[in-house]
Every structure is written in structure tokens, then in C-alpha cells.
């Protein structure tokens, strides 16, 4: 049975309006989720335009088929159930050589967080899972119970940026020697027990960063985003645009770096002109990230950490 997707879209108008949508264009929503961005983008297209929507979660696609039904009936939407790291290959299979714009809403979606059984939330007791793609083999249970101490420390530092990574990894190691760690609540309590009392008084849940780290590892989120964004920039037509929403510093740092590399050029000083093959292929549409308005922040608590970066294709 399909579970309803209740998802408040973040930076809805900013993300799509910044794409400067052409009514007859070909567009991609790389992270379908609750289909809010897709629905608004489709409202700007004529019947000659087309949207390709990616999601590896069948539940998201099932719900989007209801929400976007009027556009589906007009033949304006193609759903692709796959990880967006396969963006270029899947679009080529569909006969698409270039696109006019693409948007990303990175990270875990609200419905995935809210569905207890998915095991993403440290606030709800559930089996350790955290897979965005339910067909994938690696789960949070595998990471927590089978990764050795050094690998746990590595992912906690790298993806969670938690200064107590070593202490937490050691506590996990000790706990699983007694019995496997099976639920989100068990893990959250172990993490909590590894932190000093003064840390527990700080704002925010003590398990937040570690849960983020495990989720990123399970889904290879940063690796997939890196590959996909580069493919997207390659596939953009001239004047095509890419919008990327991020929710934590690791995603934002990655996006900023990819855009910087694509929009700058390293040439010797005094060179009279820049050869075509060295010209930057992108330019930043906004120098600084676009943040949610005060109204949105008040209406949607989950928008607080959101940042939007936008770039435009200027050279093939």
C-alpha cells in the first residue's frame, strides 16, 4: 500500500524561477521527493515541454503519479526510478542529449524522515535502515554492527564532523560485543552516553551528526551528488541552468566547489586571449547562496539550514 508523502517544499519559487524556464524546454527534477518542485516547474511548461523526474524511492514516484496526474495525461512527464548518479546514462537511454535546466533538493526528504520504519530518525524507534533505495543492500545496521572501529571513526569525522567520533565509535564497539545494535533508539542512547554532560546541554540532539554520517555512508550521498552535478553541467544546453538546494555544510561545500571549478579558469598571466578549450563552461547566477525568506523560516522549520546555489551554462 502506498504511504502518503507529506512534504513541504523548500525554496520552491526561488529554485524554479532561477531556472528561467523556457515553456518548450526539456527539464529534469533530479530529486522528485514530494513533487513540489516538479509541479511548479510543469506549471511553467507548455505541452511541448517535458520533465524527467528521478527518484530511487518507489513510494515517491507512486505519490507523484497522483499529484502530477494532469501533466502525465498530457504526456509531459517521464519518471525514472534510479539514483541520480546515473543521470546522463538514463537520459541518453530516453533519447535526451541536452537539457535546458535541472534542479536538485539534496538529502533525505521529510516523508522518509517521518516514516518510522525507514530508520532515518533518532526521534523514532525503528530498525536501523536509512536506505533511500529500499532495494539497496547496505543498511545502517550493517554499518553500525560490522564496520570496524577505524571505519566508524572515519565516517563520523568525515560525514558527521563530530569531535567525539572516537569516543562514540568505541562505545558502539563495546555495546555490540554484548549484543547487536538493532534500533535507532538503542544507537541514539549509545551516542548520548559517549558525550560529556556539558555537550548534552547544548542545543540540538546529540545523535544528529552521527545519524547524518551513517545516512550519507549508507546512500553514498556525496559521491552520488558529485557525479550527478558534473553530469548535469555537461548535459546543459547553452544558457541552461542548474539549481541545487543543500541542507548541511558538506553538501554546500561540494556544490560550491563544483560550481567554482566550472566557472573559473587557470591561465598564465599575460595570455592575450583564452583558448576555447580553456574557457569556463559555467557562470554563477548568484554570487552567494540564496536563503529562505523570514516567512518561509517561520512556516517550515526544516528550511532553516537550506541554501540554494544556481549556475548557468555559457560555453559548451
Swiss-Prot record:
S-adenosyl-L-methionine binds at residues 35-37, 55, 84, 105, 112. Keywords: Cytoplasm, Methyltransferase, rRNA processing, S-adenosyl-L-methionine, Transferase. Its EC number is 2.1.1.199. It is found in: Cytoplasm. It catalyses: cytidine(1402) in 16S rRNA + S-adenosyl-L-methionine = N(4)-methylcytidine(1402) in 16S rRNA + S-adenosyl-L-homocysteine + H(+). NCBIfam families: 16S rRNA (cytosine(1402)-N(4))-methyltransferase RsmH. PANTHER family: 12S RRNA N4-METHYLCYTIDINE METHYLTRANSFERASE, S-ADENOSYL-METHYLTRANSFERASE MRAW. This is Ribosomal RNA small subunit methyltransferase H. It comes from Streptococcus pneumoniae (strain Taiwan19F-14). The gene is rsmH.
Amino acid at each position: 500500500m502506498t504511504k502518503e508523502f507529506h512534504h513541504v517544499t523548500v525554496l520552491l519559487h526561488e529554485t524554479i524561477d532561477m531556472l528561467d524556464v523556457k515553456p518548450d524546454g526539456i527539464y529534469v527534477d533530479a530529486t522528485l521527493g514530494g513533487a513540489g518542485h516538479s509541479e511548479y516547474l510543469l506549471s511553467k511548461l507548455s505541452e511541448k515541454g517535458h520533465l524527467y523526474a528521478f527518484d530511487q524511492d518507489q513510494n515517491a514516484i507512486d505519490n507523484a503519479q497522483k499529484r502530477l496526474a494532469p501533466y502525465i495525461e498530457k504526456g509531459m512527464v517521464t519518471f525514472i526510478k534510479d539514483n541520480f548518479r546515473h543521470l546522463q546514462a538514463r537520459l541518453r537511454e530516453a533519447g535526451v542529449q541536452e537539457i535546458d535546466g535541472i534542479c536538485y533538493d539534496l538529502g533525505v526528504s521529510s516523508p522518509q524522515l517521518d516514516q518510522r520504519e525507514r530508520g532515518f530518525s533518532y526521534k523514532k524507534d525503528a530498525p536501523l535502515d536509512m536506505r533511500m533505495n529500499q532495494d539497496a543492500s547496505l543498511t545502517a545496521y550493517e554499518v553500525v554492527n560490522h564496520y570496524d572501529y577505524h571505519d566508524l571513526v572515519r565516517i563520523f569525522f568525515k560525514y558527521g564532523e563530530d569531535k567525539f567520533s572516537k569516543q562514540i565509535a568505541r562505545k558502539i564497539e563495546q555495546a555490540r560485543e554484548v549484543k547487536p545494535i538493532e534500533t535507532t533508539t538503542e544507537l541514539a542512547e549509545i551516542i548520548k552516553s559517549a558525550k560529556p554532560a556539558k555537550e548534552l546541554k547544548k542545543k540540538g540532539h546529540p545523535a544528529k551528526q552521527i545519524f547524518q554520517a551513517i545516512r550519507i555512508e549508507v546512500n553514498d550521498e556525496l559521491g552520488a551528488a558529485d557525479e550527478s552535478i558534473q553530469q548535469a553541467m555537461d548535459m546543459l544546453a547553452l544558457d541552461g541552468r542548474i539549481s541545487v538546494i543543500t541542507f548541511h555544510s558538506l553538501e554546500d561545500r561540494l556544490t560550491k566547489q563544483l560550481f567554482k571549478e566550472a566557472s573559473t579558469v587557470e591561465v598564465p598571466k599575460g595570455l592575450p586571449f583564452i583558448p576555447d578549450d580553456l574557457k569556463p563552461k559555467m557562470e554563477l547566477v548568484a554570487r552567494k547562496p540564496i536563503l529562505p525568506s523570514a516567512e518561509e523560516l517561520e512556516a517550515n522549520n526544516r528550511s532553516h539550514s537550506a541554501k540554494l546555489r544556481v549556475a548557468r551554462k555559457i560555453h559548451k
